[in-house]
UniProtKB/Swiss-Prot annotation:
This is UPF0246 protein PSPA7_1607. The lineage of its organism: Bacteria, Pseudomonadati, Pseudomonadota, Gammaproteobacteria, Pseudomonadales. It comes from Pseudomonas paraeruginosa (strain DSM 24068 / PA7) (Pseudomonas aeruginosa (strain PA7)). InterPro entries: YaaA (IPR005583). GO terms for cellular component: cytosol. It comes from the Bacteria. GO terms for biological process: response to hydroperoxide. Pfam families: H2O2_YaaD. Belongs to the UPF0246 family.
Length: 259
């Protein structure tokens, strides 16, 4: 079973990594193509394109200028430890053992507007480029056109390498939109996490993001390979709803927040 999650806008390059192991991103030629295009934009253009403040636009213009594909632990950090935010709070990779990282490296992928697909231990230099950004490029009007079917092909390769055909989608719609479902040689399992609010179960973004991270953590810590085991997920009060679920859509409910 292979999992995919979204990246995060917030990055942490200050905290020392809890593992010294690292790998190199596999698709840097494509990343470099995007960087070369981003370098042509002024901070004002970046601000307008990405709807960023002047300060953040300037920061990312500097990031694009200093980005280079010679990644080392001195100028980059493992992706799973560099990303912060709700998903990564739930995932809590800082508490992983070396065996946890080894399992995650095989069974977890992060989708990225700049890097396409990242493995947990892939070194990553800081950036801001959300998948939904309408960055016109040689392949089309946006990043979905830029990546085309590549991401699906790379996920197929990862599935083939582990001899499996199950993809657990824990990514947002924005990011999983870059995956061509019909091109995937896999059974796709989607997930929903709902919390009780005003008498109804609803998807509450903050909680749902954190729950997706907790589900990824559950799979890693339990060394889960059979999707049937996903139904036993019960972190922080969530429980599987057979009534609301289907064969390829697993729904988890929670009656009260526990965090």
């Amino acid at each position: 079973m292979l999992m995919v999650i979204s990246p995060a806008k917030t990055l942490d390059y200050e905290t020392p990594p809890v593992t010294q192991r690292f790998t190199q991103p596999q698709y840097l030629d494509h990343s470099q193509e995007l960087i070369q295009q981003l370098r042509q934009l002024t901070p004002l253009q970046i601000s307008e394109l990405m709807k960023l403040s002047d300060k953040l636009a300037g920061l990312n213009a500097a990031r694009y200028a200093s980005w280079h594909p010679d990644f080392t632990p001195q100028n980059a950090k493992q992706a799973l430890l560099a990303f912060k935010g709700d998903v990564y709070t739930g995932l809590d990779a800082e508490s992983f053992s070396e065996d946890d990282f080894a399992f995650a490296q095989e069974h977890l992928r992060m989708l990225s507007g700049l890097y396409g697909v990242l493995r947990p231990l892939d070194l990553m230099q800081p950036y801001r480029l959300e998948m939904g950004t309408r960055l016109a490029n040689a392949r089309g009007k946006d990043l979905y056109a830029f990546w085309g079917e590549r991401i699906s092909q790379w996920l197929n390769e990862a599935l083939a390498a582990q001899g499996d055909d199950v993809l657990l989608n824990l990514a947002s719609n924005e990011y999983f939109g870059a995956v061509k479902r019909k091109a995937l040689q896999a059974r796709i399992i989607d997930t929903e996490f709902k919390d009780l609010k005003n008498g109804q179960y609803k998807i509450i973004s903050f909680y749902a993001k954190k729950a997706r991270g907790m589900m990824a953590r559950y799979v890693v810590r339990e060394r889960l390979r059979d999707p049937a085991g996903l139904k036993d997920f019960n972190a922080h009060g969530y429980y599987f709803s057979a009534e609301q679920s289907g064969p390829e859509q697993l729904v988890f409910l929670r009656d009260a927040p526990q965090d």
